[in-house]
Every structure is written in structure tokens, then in C-alpha cells.
Amino acid sequence: MPVQGSQRRLLGSLNSTPTATPHLGLAANQTGARCLEVSVPDGLFLSLGLVSLVENVLVVTAIAKNRNLHSPMYCFICCLALSDLLVSGSNMLETAVTLLLEAGVLAARAAVVQQLDNVIDVITCSSMLSSLCFLGAIAVDRYISIFYALRYHSIVTLPRARRAVAAIWVASVLFSTLFIAYYDHAAVLLCLVIFFLAMLVLMAVLYVHMLARACQHAQGIARLHKRQRLAHQGFGLKGAATLTILLGIFFLCWGPFFLHLTLIVLCPQHPTCSCIFKNFNLFLALIICNAIIDPLIYAFRSQELRRTLKEVLLCSW
């Protein structure tokens, strides 16, 4: 994505000679001060992308194969996997092309590399936006299934889910194209940050409300069976821990990237901010880590999906 700190890796590889950098070391910022820079080796970057790619391909394949999984909830999970797949795949492609250019194996004119870089940036940005949207859509779907259980199947229908999916993809591609075209405008970066914060608040509010309802339900059962009071307390702690992990992973993996964008607007020339900008590739790696974790949280916990996945793997052998 063409923001300060990414250093336009594809274009930079045409005119610069790569130098060996430590995995973790001190680098000088613009004022000559020393700051911590975490370098992500290309091999690790590609490995993370490959793991994410395989995981999400398996999720998409399993959902597509099993008709029992053709429901609105799994439709959103499938699209989340597809978005994460594109995030990982586009970053892997950029890294691979960069390595080939640096090694002299691939020769290309600057104009061609520029166009390729723009295409990859649009794919990466649109898949990031759609991934965030589908995380929000999954939260809304689960909220409706709990608070409007009797009307769920009339509210969340497959045609409506498909229209929502289509709207998310179209909006993601459209806005990502605009963001890439006008990436040097502060308003564009602020829009991205506000969008991330909106998704974070939406997920936090919905999941906290769902946890509160679940605890109330468990408390009601405990009143009928006084001996189960300790079990109710254990349920509350387990639910709070699950919620903390879910939102914590989301914030940990996505937060640094959007902090990076925020600092570009607030303090582009400040020495401390310059140090943070140097870790842009680390922030991308964290997003890919989120693409690895998403299937574990949203997909592989389904017994039906795991059974289908096992059948797919056995048939492939």
C-alpha cells in the first residue's frame, strides 16, 4: 500500500541495491537518533502468507463443497476467508516480484512495475477493507441470531446475505481505488482510520452485549439450580476470556497498521514517528497473522466444517 514507510518496494527494487539488515536492530532516523526497527525476513513473510493461503483455501473449499454450509453465516465466513486469502496472496506476490527484481531474474520497465504495484495495492487495500467488513458482518449476524432468534431466518436470508456480500465487495474495490489514487491526502488516511475504529467499536459493543445476555441466561438457570452457581461464575469468566481474546487479537493485529496511518497524518516528520514508520512491514505481517488466526476462530470451530474438510483431504489423497 503506497503510504509513507512502505517505501514502494517494487519501484525501489529497480533503483536500489538491497543491503543486509538485521532481524532486530537499531536504525537511525532522520535526526540521527537511534530507534528500534524490527525487520521481517522475506522468507518469514512468504511462509506466513503461504500458511494463511492454505488455511483459507481449505475453508472456502469446504464451504463450497458442503450444501449444509450454504447459509448466511457461512457465506460471511467464506467471504472473510476469501478476503484473507487475497490479503496474503497479494503480499506474497509483491514480495516474490520484489525478490525476483532484486536478483535480476525478472526484468521490467519502471512503467510496468508501477502499474503492477498499483494493481497489487488495490487488491491489498480492497481485501483489507472487505476483511474488516466481513468481521463486522459476522458480529451482526451472531447478534441477530441471539437477540432475534425466532425471527432470525426471516431477517437474515440467503438472498439478503448475498446482496450484502456484493455490496461489501463493490464498495471495497471502489473505495480502495480512490484511496490508492489519493493516498497522499490526509483526509483519505483519516477515513481509513475512522473506518477501523468504527468496526472495532461495532464488534466490541455487539460482543459485549451478547456476553451480557449469555451471562443473564446462565444466571437465570443458576437460580433454578442453586448448586450450579459456581458453574455460572465459571461460564462468565470463560465468556469474558473468549471475548478478550477475540477483540484482543483483532486490535493487536490491525491496530499497529492503523496507528501507522494515524501518525502519518499527525506527525509525519517527528523523529519518534519516523521510527514507527520503519516497522511498516512488521505491521503488514501482523495483518497476515490475523488472516491465519481468523479460520481458527470463525471456521474450524464448526464440527460440520471440520468433517467436510476431513472428507476433502481424504479424497485428495
Swiss-Prot record:
InterPro entries: GPCR_Rhodpsn (IPR000276), GPCR_Rhodpsn_7TM (IPR017452), Melcrt_ACTH_rcpt (IPR001671), MSH_rcpt (IPR000761). GO terms for molecular function: melanocyte-stimulating hormone receptor activity; ubiquitin protein ligase binding. Keywords: Cell membrane, G-protein coupled receptor, Glycoprotein, Lipoprotein, Membrane, Palmitate, Receptor, Transducer, Transmembrane, Transmembrane helix. One of its GO terms (biological process) is sensory perception of pain. It comes from the Eukaryota. One of its GO terms (cellular component) is plasma membrane. Gene3D superfamilies: Rhodopsin 7-helix transmembrane proteins. Disulfide bonds: none annotated. The keyword Transmembrane helix applies. The keyword tRNA processing does not apply. It is found in: Cell membrane. Residues 1-37, 94-118, 184-191, 267-279 are extracellular. Glycans are attached at N29. Pfam families: 7tm_1. A lipid is attached at C315 (S-palmitoyl cysteine). Residues 64-72, 141-163, 212-240, 301-317 are cytoplasmic. PANTHER family: G-PROTEIN COUPLED RECEPTOR. Belongs to the G-protein coupled receptor 1 family. Interacts with MGRN1, but does not undergo MGRN1-mediated ubiquitination; this interaction competes with GNAS-binding and thus inhibits agonist-induced cAMP production. Interacts with OPN3; the interaction results in a decrease in MC1R-mediated cAMP signaling and ultimately a decrease in melanin production in melanocytes. This is Melanocyte-stimulating hormone receptor. It comes from Papio anubis. The lineage of its organism: Eukaryota, Metazoa, Chordata, Craniata, Vertebrata. The gene is MC1R.
